[in-house]
A protein has these predicted regions:
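Membrane-embedded alpha-helical bundles that constitute the cytochrome b-like, heme-associated redox core
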Residues: 1-154
Length: 154
């Protein structure tokens, strides 16, 4: 039952991460703080999804992390947590250790784009596993990602 909610958690994470990316592009103190809040909200949703997946595998007696989909998803999840920690500890506008370091900011920015692309790949490969050769659901999910890509990745 909990496993059925995984797509909602992961889609919610995408929505929050996309909005967080767009919010940050506008710049400024308030947008930077909102970027962190939205991103960590997305991480919390993704955590619920990861928990549901892990418990589902345990309940079925299946091994964990045996597919490209699972490793890509785990990499994206770990990347989100790492970026969130760097953002919160190093780049936070109120108490960050090095808020003006342009190199750290650039690494954070481009790493975020890579992690978001990994998350998209994991989600699309998971959807492909669920729907098989039916291309319509994949297109319905992928087209909004393609439309949103210029706003979140560029």
């Amino acid at each position: 039952m909990l496993f059925d909610s995984v797509p909602s958690y992961i889609t919610g994470m995408f929505g929050l991460m996309g909005i967080a990316a767009i919010t940050k592009k506008r710049g400024g103190y308030t947008n930077t703080k909102m970027h962190g809040i939205l991103a960590w909200s997305g991480i919390i949703l993704a955590s619920a999804g990861m928990y549901a997946i892990y418990q589902h595998k345990n309940n079925m007696g299946k091994p964990h992390f045996t597919t490209w989909h699972s490793w890509t998803g785990l990499s994206a999840f770990g990347g989100c947590i790492g970026l969130g920690l760097v953002g919160g500890v190093v780049l936070h506008p109120d108490f960050g250790l090095d808020t003006t370091n342009k190199q750290i900011r650039a690494i954070h920015k481009y790493s975020g784009r890579i992690v978001l692309m990994l998350a998209w790949m994991a989600t699309l490969s998971g959807l492909k596993t669920l729907v098989g050769d039916d291309i319509k659901p994949i297109l319905l999910f992928a087209v909004p990602l393609v439309v949103a890509a210029p706003f979140t990745l560029l």
